[in-house]
């Protein structure tokens, strides 16, 4: 049987996506698809396919005429190896569990396919910020779960294992694990403070502590928290996810002195730069730490098309078509995957079809066959222009509004034998940050190149000659400037 070359496959599917005529009756089987492209998943080292299967769309909000299990099985058959779900995605984990039984992925059962299990990367999420029950209600600290919202992170973790590998009632077989747990949907700085309790502060087993030190126990098989008395190793990696607040996500990464965070799931699409964007803010920080980076919200949760620009409420909000003639889906996927630092993109599937030219999964698969530098800057700008007026540019309801280039944060001054000026990163607007200028008594005395600030160690400039006043200015690659307040020496 002839296997379609990548070029043949892309040309054929591109024609269909553009609404052009394809020979009547032409079909190609899944065994004719070119092998999926992969990228090294940051410091995790796993060779991840550029397309991952998202656990929402019809896996969460299942239309009456859709069975989610064949969607998962088809993704496996096509060679997709990254799978995403969450404890907030309704029955999504249960659907994965049904598919895993058909694929012999249940440890301890006859025919368990350990090789297949090792070939995939399975991620779930917890929106619990605390490790165990009995936590205070704090402003801007949300603890949500479709299971027990008051149960803490361990309850969520074991719920995931039970739903995907066990009986769905809290039990799971020995040998069960998830490749990664992400802290779900980081929105506020206050949540970061809670999640680092027990790391930045001593562990007090009589009190509560954050999700990170808790998950670390179940990654390493330790029992520092007292929550893992069997010394189970149930997860292999820990990460974070977020769509709203790049500064909070930067803070989460910077505070990780223990190298706990291996990956980040982040919203990225062609309208990103209309908002407080991620591609020039948190993504470079995660990339500088060699984290695995997963793209989501490639189609703005469907708002690039016919869906309302708000959180999906039910199956009526699930998109079940492949792009439109006016706005093909392929360039939007290519945009996300050519954003510097991105390794894979998870995309939810509304439906699959026997006609591969109309199948969301197949069409997303071919669109994801793009190299990291596969689009020119000009082409990326053209894609941005094609979407900037969709819903008047208000597609990314899940993202903080545009605020422009900011001054450096937390500027301070110390005097001893010399003057030392310290500051934290500015936040970029449309263009990446370039450098910082230091002014003494209104005159330029130094420049400091911007680098992603990967820790809480600040930028520093030392001045041997003492002046009366100092100011630090952030400058982006277009020459835009933002001045911090003047400090008196």
Annotate each predicted stretch with a short phrase.
Residues 2-121, 130:
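N-terminal binding-site loop/beta-alpha segment at the start of enzyme catalytic domains
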Residues 41, 53, 83, 122, ...:
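Conserved, mostly hydrophobic/aromatic
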Residues 54-65, 126, 136-152, 316-324:
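Active-site mouth loops of central-metabolism enzymes
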Residues 142-270, 287-294:
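Glycine/proline-rich, positively charged
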Residues 257-260, 281-417, 422-434:
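Structured C-terminal cap/extension of enzyme domains
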Residues 435-465:
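Recognizes extended acidic, P/S/T-rich segments that occur
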Residues 461-479:
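Beta-strand-rich modules
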Residues 477-489:
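Extracellular fibronectin type III
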């Amino acid at each position: 049987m002839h296997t379609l070359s990548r070029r043949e496959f892309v040309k054929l599917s591109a024609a269909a996506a553009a609404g052009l005529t394809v020979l009547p009756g032409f079909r190609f089987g899944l065994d004719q698809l070119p092998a999926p492209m992969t990228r090294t998943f940051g410091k995790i080292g796993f060779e991840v396919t550029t397309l991952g299967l998202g656990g929402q769309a019809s896996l969460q909000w299942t239309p009456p005429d859709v069975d989610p299990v064949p969607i998962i099985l088809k993704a496996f058959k096509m060679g997709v190896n990254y799978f995403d779900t969450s404890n907030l995605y309704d029955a999504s984990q249960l659907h994965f569990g049904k598919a895993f039984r058909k694929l012999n992925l249940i440890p301890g059962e006859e025919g368990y396919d350990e090789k297949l299990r090792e070939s995939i990367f399975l991620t779930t999420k917890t929106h619990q910020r605390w490790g165990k029950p009995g936590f205070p209600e704090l402003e801007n600290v949300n603890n949500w779960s479709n299971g027990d919202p008051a149960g803490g992170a361990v309850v969520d973790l074991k719920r995931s294992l039970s739903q995907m590998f066990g009986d769905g009632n809290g039990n799971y077989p020995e040998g069960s694990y998830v490749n990664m747990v992400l802290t779900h949907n980081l929105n506020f700085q206050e949540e970061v403070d809670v999640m680092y309790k027990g790391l930045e502060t001593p562990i007090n087993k009589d009190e509560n502590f954050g999700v990170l030190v808790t998950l670390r126990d179940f990654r390493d098989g330790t029992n520092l928290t007292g929550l893992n008395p069997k010394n189970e190793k149930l997860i292999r990696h820990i990460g974070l996810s977020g769509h709203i607040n790049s500064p909070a996500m930067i803070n989460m990464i910077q505070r990780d002195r223990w190298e706990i965070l291996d990956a980040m799931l982040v919203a990225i699409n062609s309208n990103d730069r209309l908002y407080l964007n991620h591609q020039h803010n948190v993504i470079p920080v995660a990339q500088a730490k060699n984290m695995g980076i997963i793209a989501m919200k490639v189609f703005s949760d469907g708002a690039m098309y016919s869906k309302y620009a708000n959180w999906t409420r039910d199956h009526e909000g699930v998109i079940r078509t492949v792009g439109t003639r006016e706005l093909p889906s392929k360039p939007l996927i290519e945009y996300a995957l050519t954003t510097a630092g991105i390794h894979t993109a998870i995309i939810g599937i509304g439906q699959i079809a026997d006609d591969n030219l109309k199948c969301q999964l197949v069409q997303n698969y071919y669109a994801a066959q793009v190299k990291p530098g596969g689009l020119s800057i000009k082409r990326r700008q053209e894609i941005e222009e094609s979407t900037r007026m969709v819903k008047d540019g208000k597609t990314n309801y899940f993202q903080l509004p545009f605020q422009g280039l900011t001054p450096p944060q937390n500027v301070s001054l110390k005097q001893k034998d010399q003057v030392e000026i310290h500051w934290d990163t500015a936040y970029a607007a449309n263009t990446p940050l370039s450098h910082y200028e230091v002014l003494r008594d209104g005159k330029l005395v130094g420049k400091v190149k911007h680098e992603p600030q990967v820790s809480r160690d600040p930028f520093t400039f030392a001045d041997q000659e003492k002046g009366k006043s100092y100011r630090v200015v952030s400058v982006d690659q277009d020459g835009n400037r933002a001045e911090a307040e003047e400090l008196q020496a």
